Regions:
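Hydrophobic ligand-binding cavity/cleft-lining segments
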Residues: 1-41
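Short, solvent-exposed secondary-structure boundary motifs
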Residues: 1-2, 26-32, 47-54, 72-78
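Intrinsic-disorder/low-complexity, polar/charged segments enriched in Ser/Thr/Lys/Arg/Asp/Glu/Gln
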Residues: 3-9, 46, 56, 82, ...
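Amphipathic alpha-helical hairpins
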Residues: 10, 32, 69-70, 115, ...
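Hydrophobic pocket/interface hotspot
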Residues: 19-23, 29, 47, 61, ...
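Residue-level recognition of beta-strand termini and adjacent short loop/turns
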Residues: 41-43, 91
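Hydrophobic-ligand binding "helix-grip"
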Residues: 52-94, 102
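A conserved amphipathic terminal alpha-helix motif
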Residues: 102-131
Length: 131
């Protein structure tokens, strides 16, 4: 069963080009992750980390649509998922950002991961707002 988790849309204090550039180098992602994210490792195109009670997750950049959308996909993860970062220009110095995570989950798994994923999205977007 396809399950979507969506963040609120927030305003980042970077224009869409600068934010896109930061998010397409996964080494920069550590600066935007909540403090409760553990075991973060990265290179330019891949990263892995652990969130609360969830298993360790690994991501790679799958698609880039200049200054608008980045699609990440899971690799070597017990729970396969895609994560999308949507970026749109707000004004010349800021952009609107939202994050979406899509997973194939049965009902039981959805109940187990719903809270940690939503907490992660809330904290992640709060950090993006402070950029």
């Amino acid at each position: 069963m396809s399950t979507n988790f969506k963040s609120q849309e927030v305003i980042a204090n970077l224009n869409s080009k600068d934010l896109f550039t930061k998010f397409t180098d996964l080494n920069n992602l550590k600066d935007y992750l909540p403090s409760d994210v553990e075991e973060f490792e990265s290179n330019t195109d891949n990263c892995s980390f652990k969130i609360e009670s969830l298993p360790k997750m690994s991501l790679r950049i799958k698609e880039k649509h200049a200054f608008k959308k980045i699609k990440f996909e899971s690799i070597k993860s017990q729970i396969p998922f895609n994560m999308f970062c949507y970026i749109s220009e707000n004004d010349k110095d800021s952009s609107k950002v939202s994050i979406e995570i899509n997973m194939e989950l049965n009902f039981m798994m959805k109940m187990l991961v719903k809270k940690p994923i939503n907490i992660f999205l809330d904290r992640f977007t709060e950090i993006i707002k402070k950029v």
